[in-house]
Amino acid sequence: MSKKTSPSMDSWLKEAKAHESAPKIGMYLTHNGIVRKSAKAKVRQGAADTRPVVGMQFSYNQEAVDAIIAETYKLDGIFYIKVWLNEGKLSVGDDIMYVLIGGDIRPHVVDALQYLVRRIKNECVTEIELY
């Protein structure tokens, strides 16, 4: 499995603004997760004895992602969602995930983005850091 070509956020936004839901949307918010050099244990738990990351083996469960997207649409004020996930062996700086979410007002969109990304990261993906 090899990594994918990253999407164009400009194209995504153009598509979203042409979608039938666009008249209800007052805000679009994007997320672009990338492979970083600092190990997850260092960033999240403050572990001092971690080696630099040189890459990541990344995979995901598409059915689980689709189910979480469907649940996110049930949140207040959310009318548009698009998600792209990479796969395979990734290098530092490579894109892992893109999310575009559109909704009526900022609090709804910010909360929905956090909900969606957290659930995808915690329930749908496998990230193996390479050293």
Locations of regions flagged by a protein language model:
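N-terminal, polar/charged subdomain of small-to-medium soluble alpha/beta proteins
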Residues: 1-95, 102-105, 110-131
